[in-house]
Amino acid sequence: MSKDFVHLHLHTQFSLLDGAIKIDELVKKAKEYGYKAVGMSDHGNLFGSYKFYKALKAEGIKPIIGMEAYFTTGSRFDRKTKTSEDNITDKYNHHLILIAKDDKGLKNLMKLSTLAYKEGFYYKPRIDYELLEKYGEGLIALTACLKGVPTYYASINEVKKAEEWVKKFKDIFGDDLYLELQANNIPEQEVANRNLIEIAKKYDVKLIATQDAHYLNPEDRYAHTVLMALQMKKTIHELSSGNFKCSNEDLHFAPPEYMWKKFEGKFEGWEKALLNTLEVMEKTADSFEIFENSTYLLPKYDVPPDKTLEEYLRELAYKGLRQRIERGQAKDTKEYWERLEYELEVINKMGFAGYFLIVQDFINWAKKNDIPVGPGRGSAGGSLVAYAIGITDVDPIKHGFLFERFLNPERVSMPDIDVDFCQDNREKVIEYVRNKYGHDNVAQIITYNVMKAKQTLRDVARAMGLPYSTADKLAKLIPQGDVQGTWLSLEEMYKTPVEELLQKYGEHRTDIEDNVKKFRQICEESPEIKQLVETALKLEGLTRHTSLHAAGVVIAPKPLSELVPLYYDKEGEVATQYDMVQLEELGLLKMDFLGLKTLTELKLMKELIKERHGVDINFLELPLDDPKVYKLLQEGKTTGVFQLESRGMKELLKKLKPDSFDDIVAVLALYRPGPLKSGLVDTYIKRKHGKEPVEYPFPELEPVLKETYGVIVYQEQVMKMSQILSGFTPGEADTLRKAIGKKKADLMAQMKDKFIQGAVERGYPEEKIRKLWEDIEKFASYSFNKSHSVAYGYISYWTAYVKAHYPAEFFAVKLTTEKNDNKFLNLIKDAKLFGFEILPPDINKSDVGFTIEGENRIRFGLARIKGVGEETAKIIVEARKKYKQFKGLADFINKTKNRKINKKVVEALVKAGAFDFTKKKRKELLAKVANSEKALMATQNSLFGAPKEEVEELDPLKLEKEVLGFYISGHPLDNYEKLLKNRYTPIEDLEEWDKESEAVLTGVITELKVKKTKNGDYMAVFNLVDKTGLIECVVFPGVYEEAKELIEEDRVVVVKGFLDEDLETENVKFVVKEVFSPEEFAKEMRNTLYIFLKREQALNGVAEKLKGIIENNRTEDGYNLVLTVDLGDYFVDLALPQDMKLKADRKVVEEIEKLGVKVII
């Protein structure tokens, strides 16, 4: 007898926080075991079905597509706690495995999964019997594990109920119903098996044996238990002591012979139960039409009756280019017309005319409806056709863009055009698309959030019951990897040879070498930590949860539910269960509709400038050589300027001193981790300013590299170099670009040979070509997409232009739209530096947003007051327009009879100073709000609730901070600045501060929360606010116990600590190690000068130079010195000899700071 077997009950990584089987690893193991077919049955979804199908087919293994559905015995519409006929809580649901036999079955499976989310979601996506009756055709059913309905009743010896459900399921599935048996050594399962065998005989239903595989190898069992602990938010110790029956099960992906041995003699008919898995395999189709689709599924675009798609695109492109030429936005030359014709031929030949027509349609609709659209994004800027028909607004020929960077004729794949829209109106464009192509044909797109290295370490440590610090120490050693800012994986940190890592990320990455060695050393020194890392390694990369893609939209030619399974989130938004990559492979049109706030701001600025100055700015026609713009950039005054506002970017601008649009483009491409760390940026700056000669590898490359002073900055430069030197076709050049960018080793090896051979054949010396290839490998991976950089460079230039020429309008709009408190505070500070006075809110003068009064005053907007909001602010402004003005508080309340104007709103307005024009103190007005019930409550019943006791003395600054988010008439730190003498770091400077490096902060405690830990200790979390920003601070129990008397709401404190990144939320927090009153701190710091050295500075000669400065400026009555050295894991304070005192005047401090050393006096 054949001892074959097929797994039909198997959970991949898409059984979220339950299945620990990665599909790629499953395929390798299935091939190793000799499986002819493998089935999948993820819980309640089909997220992984297409990926599973393609991966198995690629290795010649038959994929069997199934789903372990959540099934309710009641109605899927029921939402009560207990809705089923039995006493099983529907919160946990029943299970039923459904397998697609054929195309009809797959469509029905997708339909059931879709409806489970759309109609049946209650804790889990559920289906019911009614849906099975309607969509059961083409499906095979297995009765599942102990949570299956018949299995559950069979396990508790309620045989009649089990029989009833077997009969009901048989009515739908007939011979395609199988009663599922498992050999998992659970007593209830053994009872269920015995009863199900008898029921099978009685009703002529077949039995089937399954493994219910949840992890790949037997040794993965512990990692799976950890995964379950994460799902249930418990530790593994809590699970083992609780009612967790699965902890002793064998749930690995076993080979056939293991399954035969496992079931041998367990029950009557065990051989047939195993062989029935082969029967199911034979019943299922070898392939599915939906998954094998080789055409592009584009929605139908209506063209004039006498035109084809291709003819109509050509007509629009020629017409559009002529209009661009007439407006001076393109040249009427042979180069333009030949490029247009070439692109049209490629587009039409590849079958993408419809794609271009669809995209230009909704973009031009947006423009006609006054919805701002970005000038371009990504590689689409390389297309002249896109420019001609209005998809982009950047001339690709003028800027040297390559069409093949966007659409490679040698590699047929759907074009990818992402579009930026005004943030406030993005949804209108999507709604236009829904109305044009059908609401059922348009959906958002799911994204799978996977377990990444750092967070996985912390998760696993928590599940293992290990201290947070154990995993945190390891997580902080994981460095950033490539130019996209991703982190090294655990596989790389723990297993990959260091030489390979340096080859991949660059020989200059000594931080990677040091951190990897330290990471491995820690693992070897502790068996517990080694187990932590090896467990995390198995879970890294699993899908943790899903969310909706921020911008992705898919548009189909027919209802999407006929093509893919759909998902509905908690808000009812519909999305595909497949992500963007899978949708593209299936031939569907997916687009990124991005909302860009800056486009909204530019629109508002333009309207305000026209209103106040009568100037109608056309941003596309602005001269790109405006002196005021470049002066602003060179001085680093770019707070609020698109893409140029970070502290690091400001410093780069000051060093680079841009004086042309090309410099702005280059800055956007260069300000990324790779170029900054590799030295490319320094080389660019030195060459620009003539401090280093501009060199080209070959004279022929000067036209390509001249704009960037011989430095490879753009991907397009790499492509052009390969064409000039090696004779690459445009398509081959793009393949090279992709190989370098994606670090594809196999493809890189092929392209290297082709590059060198081609250049040598064209007469270039092999040695020099090989050296150039090494440089390309080293630096080209840092290169950036020029078309994207240029498009965003325009937006940067436009915002800088408004700031330089119309600063009042710039700040009024930016302050209105900025929701981030830190950025808002920086804008306030910047506005003051530009000479503007920020006026407090006034109920008779403030608008909804910030407004300009006179030449240099900006009035606070009502909507920015916490507790008011935009909708209420609009109601107030409308009432004021009607009544002209409000005489006072009572008059305001009488004239704004609206339920939105409640006690909370009025109190917020008073606290913000909106009634200060009455000359009455805020304390008095607040008391009136609380106590003048008779006078104030006449307008509304119970408007203000019960009267309060007399209001205590109030601090106006505290009130302002509470409702405005910052202090407007002063600052609590004003009283301490002289005392502290700037011996602390401004919070805004932390943006560029090294994580884990110690800092001293001074500020006001706000939003204080004291929490009780699991151990019964207390800790604190609060925001610390200074004049430059705010940061969340965490005070752990030990520190809190020592400093709790100082930690009070609204108190000014000095804190020492370090920055720490919360990897789950990506928020940066400040971990407090010490807390002082300003007086205590000033006393401790008196006559002391602190110098902070990094480890590399201590080693590379800076220390010697520092010593020289100290020796030259010693004095008997100077400052004591404390030298702090950052050694990476910890800091060392070196108190220098008492007689070593320093004359600490400003010149000496500046001399020390020029060494790149931080000084605190």
From Swiss-Prot:
GO terms for cellular component: cytoplasm. One of its GO terms (biological process) is DNA replication. Keywords: Cytoplasm, DNA replication, DNA-directed DNA polymerase, Nucleotidyltransferase, Transferase. It is an enzyme of class 2 (transferase). The keyword Transferase applies. It is found in: Cytoplasm. One of its GO terms (molecular function) is DNA-directed DNA polymerase activity. Its EC number is 2.7.7.7. It catalyses: DNA(n) + a 2'-deoxyribonucleoside 5'-triphosphate = DNA(n+1) + diphosphate. Transmembrane segments: none annotated. CDD domains: DnaE_OBF, PHP_PolIIIA_DnaE3. It holds the Pfam family DNA_pol3_finger. It comes from the Bacteria. NCBIfam families: polc (TIGR00594), PRK05673.1 (NF004226). DNA polymerase III is a complex, multichain enzyme responsible for most of the replicative synthesis in bacteria. This DNA polymerase also exhibits 3' to 5' exonuclease activity. The alpha chain is the DNA polymerase. DNA polymerase III contains a core (composed of alpha, epsilon and theta chains) that associates with a tau subunit. This core dimerizes to form the PolIII' complex. PolIII' associates with the gamma complex (composed of gamma, delta, delta', psi and chi chains) and with the beta chain to form the complete DNA polymerase III complex. Belongs to the DNA polymerase type-C family. DnaE subfamily. This is DNA polymerase III subunit alpha. It comes from Aquifex aeolicus (strain VF5). The gene is dnaE.
